[in-house]
Amino acid sequence: MAARLAWRRGPGAAGQRPWLLLAPLLLVPLLVRPAEALVEGLYCGTRDCYEVLGVSRSASKAEIARAYRQLARRYHPDRYRPEPGDGPGGAPPSAEAFLLVATAYETLKDEETRKDYDYMLDHPEEYYSHYYHYYSRRLAPKVDVRVVILVSVCAISVFQYFSWWNSYNKSISYLATVPKYRIQATEIAKEQGLLKKAKEKGKNKKSKEEIRDEEENIIKNIIKSKIDIKGGYQKPQVRDLLLFQVLLAPVHLCSYIAWYCRWVYNFNIKGKEYGEEERLYIIRKSMKMSQSQFDSLEDHQKEMFLKRELWIKENYEVYKQEQEEELKKKLANDPRWKRYRRWMKNEGPGRLTFVDD
């Protein structure tokens, strides 16, 4: 029975053994690497770049450049005259000779590429590693990242500058249409006699449209000089551009560290009372407002903040709750908000269903 059992197992085991032996054989071509250092498609191909230029591996950059210039003049397509047995390093005389010389020079003139090439000559067994280093350098971007960053920052700064000027001019045009500011600017222009000069008739008679445009420009210029616009529509400042912010970042960082150290020493360690500037700073941080937003507030609002002592956390929480209640009352009396609530109550938002009507 043991012999019969062995006979029954024999065909199954014998059927599996060829597949087990065949699997390693299929992986052999993938693991086999060429033993030769010179590989077709890498650097100078099957030619030694040093032999192509006629220099040794210890040659300096100057010697490599000198050898390249001599061979380039000799094998340049415009000057090349084929002769029997002529060619760099014994290469056949053809138009490929000049390309081979140029490739050898490009390989050896760069220190990093030359190191990779020398490493390939010394370690021919690392076949796939040589391919990786060769194509990683060829496909790497040639442009310096620092130049790209600098150009991008300059482009953003230029866009910021013109965009801010456009917003500022729009704000001036809007203020010129507001009766309050327009009447004041017109009175100032009359006092200075600017409107009379615009209407004076000289040798070149002006049309009504030209006079109107000139008066409009006078009013806008007075508004620019008399009104200090703050916030997002303020007059553009060069120091606010991204380029100057990046350049001045170390200065701002040092000044912030010095300010923070003074704050900790004066108020946390010595326990001094806050001044008006420090109180407004704490209030602004509690309200989560930027400096430009806080500066755009009216003076009476800031005085109210100081009067209510909003730099104290408990007082600010009470003020915040009051503002939320006031906002709810305004929304409750707002006709548009009432219509929205009525619509939500009667119809509600649309629903997506898959039930066939």
Curated annotation (Swiss-Prot):
One of its GO terms (cellular component) is endoplasmic reticulum membrane. Keywords: Chaperone, Membrane, Transmembrane, Transmembrane helix. SMART domains: DnaJ. The keyword Cytoplasm does not apply. GO terms for biological process: protein folding. It is a multi-pass membrane protein. Pfam families: DnaJ. Disulfide bonds: none annotated. It is found in: Membrane. InterPro entries: DnaJ_domain, DNAJC25-like, J_dom_sf. Residues 48-121 form the J domain. The chain crosses the membrane at residues 19-39, 147-167, 241-261. Belongs to the DNAJC25 family. This is DnaJ homolog subfamily C member 25. It comes from Rattus norvegicus. The lineage of its organism: Eukaryota, Metazoa, Chordata, Craniata, Vertebrata. The gene is Dnajc25.
